[in-house]
Regions:
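A residue-level marker of the well-folded mature domains of exported/periplasmic proteins
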Residues: 1-244
Length: 244
């Protein structure tokens, strides 16, 4: 199992699902996380091919390299399944799966629009290049056009070995730029981003800003349950089930 993200709670659940299902089937499973480092992700895949694994599960592979990597693995006689990975066209024998990111966006960002009656100044937490992020961005742009009263002030994001910490720093800088009353809400396209935003809101005393997100974890639920929590909504599918 090779995933182009770090060891956040969502990834932990995804991997746990794969390990649990693999154990039931009698498989021996190795897991590799590349923390959003495309070069490292490709190295992991090439190593798996050279080591002649029987099967490979890829998650969060990006353009322009993923299709060629998948074809290389298939040509080597390896069974391949991909999740939220940028594979172009149909490759015989390859299982391709993804979330319904348009619905996730409509439910989470759509709730923000409803809560603010179609008028709000917002910050978006997002990064380009990952297939689910691109699909969420497309759905978001459609909703923005339908709701001209929603104004995007900033769009920030970082995929690294410390997504939460890096995002908290970026959001903290934005909070310093916009005084109270200038930002109504933050919309996160990934809960790891939202965890960082939550940290920044609490540390800077800016919990008047409401937080909406996609994806869920046990940590998220704890933060949402805290007294006076600004985290209002998170919409998700079960990452453990996806991994399985």
């Amino acid at each position: 199992v090779i995933r182009n993200l770090g060891s956040d709670d969502n990834t932990t659940q995804f991997v746990a699902g794969a390990l649990q299902e693999g154990k039931k089937l009698g498989f021996k499973i190795s897991t590799f996380l590349s923390n959003g480092d495309d070069a490292k992700f490709q190295d992991f895949v090439n190593q798996a091919i050279s080591q002649k694994y029987d099967g490979i599960i890829l998650s969060q592979g990006r353009d322009p390299y993923s299709t060629a990597l998948v074809k290389k693995a298939v040509d080597a006689g390896i069974k391949v399944a991909v999740f939220d990975t940028a594979v172009s066209g149909e490759i015989p024998g390859v299982t391709v799966s993804q979330q319904d990111d348009a619905s996730l966006t409509e439910l989470s960002f759509g709730q923000l629009v409803k809560d603010f009656n179609g008028k709000a100044n917002i910050v978006k937490l997002w990064v380009a290049g990952f297939p689910p992020m691109e699909r969420r961005q497309a759905a978001y742009q459609t909703l923005l056009k339908q709701n001209p009263g929603i104004k995007e002030l900033e769009s920030i994001g970082a995929v690294s070995s410390d997504v939460q910490g890096d995002t908290a720093n970026k959001v903290g800088a934005i909070l310093a730029k916009y005084p109270k009353g200038k930002i109504d809400a933050i919309w996160g396209t990934w809960d790891a981003f939202s965890q960082g935003a939550y940290k920044a809101l609490k540390e800077n005393g800016r919990t008047e800003i409401k937080l909406y997100s996609i994806d869920i974890s046990n940590q998220d639920l704890q933060l949402m349950r805290e007294a006076g929590s600004p985290w209002k909504v998170s919409v998700a599918v079960d990452p453990k089930l996806i991994g399985a």
